């Protein structure tokens, strides 16, 4: 699976804790991230991470484009709901695309743990069957 990892500044440490905890599962998949988040994850875990641009410089949009092309299977996005983000429209657009293309999206630790454990159990088989379909009209 192709999994995108994104975190606002105040949530990066939380995301790294999640990735370290589930590295034994995530190492079997391709990890993608926005710039700073990806670099921090790679440094902290040793896992290979393909880095897009930083979120405010278009990284969220790059991940959104990958979703629209059928190239992402899951998004874990630890948002900071208490701090205004200058690129909030990009964040909203990414979340919208996840809904349009039925891509699993989690924005917090609890939901992310469920998604990652579901990967290990093979719970995303129907997603593979419909992954490249056009979105509904």
Swiss-Prot record:
This is Methylglyoxal synthase. Gene3D superfamilies: Methylglyoxal synthase-like domain. One of its GO terms (biological process) is methylglyoxal biosynthetic process. Its EC number is 4.2.3.3. It comes from Exiguobacterium sp. (strain ATCC BAA-1283 / AT1b). The active site is at residue 60. Substrate binds at residues 8, 12, 34-37, 54-55, 87. GO terms for molecular function: methylglyoxal synthase activity. CDD domains: MGS (cd01422). One of its GO terms (cellular component) is cytosol. SUPFAM superfamilies: Methylglyoxal synthase-like. Signal peptide: none annotated. Belongs to the methylglyoxal synthase family. Pfam families: MGS. The keyword Lyase applies. The gene is mgsA. Catalyzes the formation of methylglyoxal from dihydroxyacetone phosphate. SMART domains: MGS (SM00851). Keywords: Lyase. Residues 1-137 form the MGS-like domain. Disulfide bonds: none annotated. It catalyses: dihydroxyacetone phosphate = methylglyoxal + phosphate. The keyword Lyase applies.
């Amino acid at each position: 699976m192709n999994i995108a990892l994104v975190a606002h500044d105040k949530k990066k440490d939380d995301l790294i804790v999640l990735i370290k905890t589930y590295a034994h599962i995530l190492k079997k998949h391709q990890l993608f991230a926005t710039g700073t988040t990806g670099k921090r994850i790679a440094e902290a875990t040793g896992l290979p991470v393909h880095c897009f641009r930083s979120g405010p410089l278009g990284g969220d949009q790059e991940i959104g484009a990958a979703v629209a092309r059928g190239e992402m299977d899951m998004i874990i996005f630890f948002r900071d709901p208490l701090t205004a983000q200058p690129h909030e429209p990009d964040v909203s657009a990414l979340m919208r695309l996840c809904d349009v293309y039925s891509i699993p999206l989690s924005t917090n630790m609890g939901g992310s743990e469920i998604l990652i454990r579901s990967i290990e159990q093979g719970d995303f088989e129907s997603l593979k069957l419909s992954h490249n379909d056009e979105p509904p009209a």
